[in-house]
Amino acid sequence: MNNVDYDLLIVGGGMVGASLACALDGQDLRIGLIEAAPLTVSAHPGYDDRTLALAQGTRRIFQTLDLWETLAATATPIRQIHISERGSPGFAHLDCRDEGVEALGYVAEARLIGAALLAKLPTLRNVELLCPARLETVRIEPDAACIDVRFADERTVE
């Protein structure tokens, strides 16, 4: 078993884990990203053909991560939102023009978001991709947390 020290381990290379890894690029941290599936869009269950509504805050995060330019080409702007309940006289209507923004949010395919994130991961300077691999055990010791990782080829690291 090989011993490797990381400042931070991210378990899961889905949208949240991959976004976190991208956001921490350039920090003075040695980061490992553990993912059970191969890091390809077709292999990852989270990067499927579902469409997701992205808030303006998410767009700003993707912009900061230098991903929005790639996603903007296929994302559909949400310009109006109508909220009502069947049988109830009340409703709410939101319009991007009233808010002074280009869009209230965007609709994008999970597969395309995944493709943008996965294309960026190998370029990160301080993130080591540990995949396909799975977290085996976690032990808390006085000065560190020890984690055993098993790769698909049965190699292990601690």
Residue ranges, per PLM feature:
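N-terminal FAD cofactor-binding segment of flavoenzymes
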Residues: 46-86
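Glycine-rich FAD pyrophosphate-binding loop
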Residues: 25-50
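Conserved N-terminal helical subregion
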Residues: 4-5, 74-158
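Anionic group-transfer/hydrolysis microenvironments
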Residues: 9, 37, 111
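N-terminal Rossmann-like FAD-binding beta1-loop-alpha1 element of flavoenzymes
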Residues: 4-33
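Short glycine-rich hinge loops at helix-strand junctions in the catalytic core
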Residues: 28, 66, 126
